[in-house]
Amino acid sequence: MVVFQNFSLMPWMTVFDNIRLAVRAAHPDWHRTNVDRFVQRYVDMVGLTGAERKRPAALSGGMRQRVGLARAFSTEPKVLLLDEPFAQIDALTRGVIQDELVRMWTASRSTVFMVTHDVDEAIVLSDRVALMTSGPEARLAELVDVKLPRPRSRAALIDEPEYLRLRTHILRFLVHGARSGPGEEPRGLPEDARETTRLGDPMAPLTSAASQA
């Protein structure tokens, strides 16, 4: 199952019907009553109770993405792919929906792959970060284990040494290791890298820095 950056909802359908479409496809033998009860569970889970009959045009970007997440998790997938799901959402809403994503993952324990250009988002949400070389022939350069304990508080992470170490490591990769050319092995990080990383606002989005890598 995939959650896209551009929401990809059926514009003529309500919130409830967009989610129900996925549930019925996943469970064609279910009675309508069971389907509706299951759909309502996921509507409530993403905080859209009361908005069930609204169509996508009447929703904010954050609400639309909540519908997309609810639709994806309602199929109870073993593997879920998130393609920059928070890229079009403002920073405050992004944090709220990220927390909802973690809660849904905690309940389902599905395997989730998320594509992101935000270094902090990757560290806060994931158990492992896959660092890729630059395109057009991008390859896996390194797997970074994120062993920060859960649940993770953004406020607490700001002063967490392991969080700062991970953030610095990934940023240095973007500077030193991501630009391996075609036919070259990923260079990785120089052990004697001397550049320092500005950590004044460790939770700031880093989309520009990552997308240039």
Which residues fall in each region the model found?
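ABC nucleotide-binding domain signature
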Residues: 1-7, 111-113
